[in-house]
């Protein structure tokens, strides 16, 4: 059975009076006022959850960090619906934090370059429902949780940052906008020291508290303060997005347009008659006016009115929609990629000049990506012209074929087209026979060369990854500061073992409240004291420089807590009675409550030595002898929190 402290881990929403807590089958969202359950997020194995974190901007979303390296974002106000599934490659998560950072920069009159992208038409995308292909506005991949929110009063662009620590604590992953990962190597962290708490001091500034009492600072400030660096990051993310945007629509052309049309032609012409025989007999019909019995039978029984309309519809869709996609998707995307690559190259060159003594950027991959983008644009324009010619041939063929079909079906049919009016009709018709009535004619390349496009776009994707790895990541890593670990408590307790139990930043205050367990190392002359093992201290630190604000207070543990596991004690910043009620709601087995006010012996005559005496609230489960215990509010500099203790497991 999992520890009760994990079962009743409560995390309050920063904006709404709701909280998230673990239940047997996942996470549940409750309203604080009446404890009504608002949503349930099912999770098959709750032990795979590393931790979870609220959206601090709108309060609508919850990020759940899983130990397998995935992050799931759920919309709490839509029944906990999954809106995004993120995967960080080669990472096993131990703990993570989600930060939404508004990007605010003062307008600079010296910026002479206007943003050409703003003057380009908005991107669109093609989708297919059960009936037809439609055009809809394009939305970014993570727009469901990153897009503009009508309830968000801050209209500034935001940089979403998921900071993830891996299980070995030797690597930190900074995941930008749910799409772009930058890995930071941390060589000075001992693997056996687990990360206990990540505290956000301010936007992009975090204090990471480890079990041994050491603290490490992660600071994204230099990155956020450099508009050019943020632009560099945005450019590479947009280039990656646009490449995926084109690849998605290329597969759409192949799946929804080219393949259905060419498969139909293959079944109707090759499998039902044979390409070679059909081509020669259609040529004889056109040049000599002769029609064989087999051809007439094929026209009447295999083609017929229904298949004729189907053939014409699929062909028109294949040619016309492909031209539309190339014109409205590929051309704008190529133009944007070329512009963004030029912008990216300019920033990298500027950084290279600025830091020429220590860093020189190799822009070979950038040049290759630029040339590939230009090549793709040229190939797209040529394909549009070629498809226009093919569509003309297709239309002429069906004008002639319509008369031939209805002649076979109806002896009294009157011809509707006189091809003598078109001097090139005969040549165009025979050219179409050569083009479509052959094995080569029903390959995907007969519409557009999908393989050629796919190979070129994939090579562009490889170049983008190369640029990200060789040029962008190295620059971003230089602008993210990971300080060496600081041993905050070593000087104060030089001969003791420190075990940090918890640390929290109280809202609207610039200090951190910590809870530590201090175990003194007994000398040979000094007898072992059980009291030394269970000495808890509560104190405060400045959030930025970790300076000690006031003398810490020792926690006098009530006798009722002797059998509770102090090493798992943590803060719960809420009302104690609410916590007990939460426990009761979360698990109906917890049905009995004992409240005992603890007061030390001779309490009224006792001098104030800085020790905190705490009342105890205990919740027990009679069926399996598991307990949850929590203290009353512990006041620290005018603010308060509660402590929670899980029961020690009894050895059988």
UniProtKB/Swiss-Prot annotation:
Pathway listed: Protein modification; protein ubiquitination
Coarse class of the protein's main subcellular location: cytoplasm
Keyword line: Cell cycle, Cell division, Cytoplasm, Mitosis, Nucleus, Ubl conjugation pathway
Subcellular location: Cytoplasm; Nucleus
Domain of life: Eukaryota
Purpose: Component of the anaphase promoting complex/cyclosome (APC/C), a cell cycle-regulated E3 ubiquitin-protein ligase complex that controls progression through mitosis and the G1 phase of the cell cycle. The APC/C is thought to confer substrate specificity and, in the presence of ubiquitin-conjugating E2 enzymes, it catalyzes the formation of protein-ubiquitin conjugates that are subsequently degraded by the 26S proteasome.
Assembly behavior: The APC/C is composed of at least 13 subunits that stay tightly associated throughout the cell cycle: APC1, APC2, APC4, APC5, APC9, APC11, CDC16, CDC23, CDC26, CDC27, DOC1, MND2 and SWM1.
Protein name: Anaphase-promoting complex subunit 4
Species annotation: Saccharomyces cerevisiae (strain ATCC 204508 / S288c)
Organismal lineage: Eukaryota, Fungi, Dikarya, Ascomycota, Saccharomycotina
């Amino acid at each position: 059975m999992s520890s009760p402290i994990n079962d009743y881990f409560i995390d309050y929403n920063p904006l709404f009076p709701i909280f998230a807590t673990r239940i047997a089958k996942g996470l549940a969202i409750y309203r604080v006022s009446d404890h009504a359950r608002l949503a349930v997020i099912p999770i098959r194995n709750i032990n795979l959850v590393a931790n979870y974190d609220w959206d601090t901007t709108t309060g609508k979303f919850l990020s759940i960090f899983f130990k397998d390296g995935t992050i799931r974002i759920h919309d709490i106000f839509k029944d906990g619906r999954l809106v995004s599934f993120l995967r960080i490659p080669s990472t096993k998560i131990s703990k993570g934090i989600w930060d939404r950072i508004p990007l605010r920069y003062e307008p600079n009159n010296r910026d002479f370059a206007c943003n050409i992208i703003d003057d380009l038409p908005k991107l669109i995308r093609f989708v297919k429902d059960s009936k037809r292909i439609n055009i809809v506005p394009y939305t970014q991949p993570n727009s469901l949780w990153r897009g503009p929110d009508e309830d968000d009063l801050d209209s500034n662009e935001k940089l979403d940052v998921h900071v993830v620590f891996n299980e070995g604590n030797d690597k930190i992953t900074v995941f930008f906008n749910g799409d772009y990962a930058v890995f930071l190597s941390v060589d000075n962290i001992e693997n056996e020291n687990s990360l206990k708490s990540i505290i956000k001091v301010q936007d992009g500034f975090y204090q990471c508290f480890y079990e041994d009492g050491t603290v490490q600072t992660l600071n994204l400030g230099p990155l956020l303060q450099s508009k050019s660096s943020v632009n560099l990051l945005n450019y590479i993310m947009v280039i990656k997005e646009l490449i995926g945007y084109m690849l998605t629509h290329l597969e759409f052309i192949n799946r929804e347009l080219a393949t259905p049309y060419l498969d139909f032609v293959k079944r109707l012409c090759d499998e039902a008659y044979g390409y070679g025989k059909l081509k020669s007999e259609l040529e004889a019909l056109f040049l000599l006016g002769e029609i064989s019995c087999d051809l007439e039978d094929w026209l009447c029984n295999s083609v017929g009115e229904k298949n004729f309309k189907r053939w014409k519809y699929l062909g028109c869709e294949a040619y016309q929609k492909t031209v539309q996609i190339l014109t409205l998707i590929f051309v704008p995307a190529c133009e944007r990629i070329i512009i963004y690559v030029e912008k990216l190259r300019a920033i990298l060159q500027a950084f290279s000049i600025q830091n020429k003594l220590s860093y020189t950027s190799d822009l070979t991959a950038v040049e290759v990506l630029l040339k590939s983008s230009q090549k793709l644009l040229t190939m797209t324009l040529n394909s549009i012209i070629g498809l226009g010619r093919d569509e003309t041939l297709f239309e002429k063929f069906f004008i002639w074929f319509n008369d031939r079909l209805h002649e076979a079906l109806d002896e009294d049919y009157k011809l509707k087209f006189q091809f003598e009016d078109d001097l090139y009709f005969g040549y165009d018709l025979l050219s179409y026979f050569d083009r479509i009535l052959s094995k080569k004619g029903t390959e995907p390349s007969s519409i557009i060369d999908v393989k050629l496009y796919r190979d070129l776009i994939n090579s562009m994707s490889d170049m983008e990854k190369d640029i990200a790895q060789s040029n962008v990541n190295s620059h971003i890593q230089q602008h993210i500061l990971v300080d060496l670990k600081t041993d905050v408590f070593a000087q104060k307790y030089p001969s003791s073992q420190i075990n940090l139990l918890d640390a929290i930043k109280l809202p609207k205050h610039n200090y951190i409240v910590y809870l530590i367990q201090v175990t003194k190392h007994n000398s040979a002359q000094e007898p072992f004291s059980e009291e030394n093992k269970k000495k808890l201290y509560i104190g405060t630190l400045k959030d930025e420089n970790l300076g000690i604000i006031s003398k810490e207070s020792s926690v006098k543990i009530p006798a009722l807590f002797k059998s509770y596991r102090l090493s798992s004690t943590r803060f719960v910043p809420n009302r104690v009675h609410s916590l007990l009620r939460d426990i009761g709601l979360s698990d109906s087995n917890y049905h009995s409550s004992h409240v005992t006010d603890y007061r030390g012996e001779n309490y009224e005559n006792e001098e104030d030595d800085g020790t905190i005496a705490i009342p105890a609230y205990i919740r027990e489960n009679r069926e399996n002898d598991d307990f949850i215990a929590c203290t009353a509010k512990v006041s620290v500099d005018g603010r308060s929190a509660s402590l929670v203790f899980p029961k020690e497991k009894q050895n059988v």
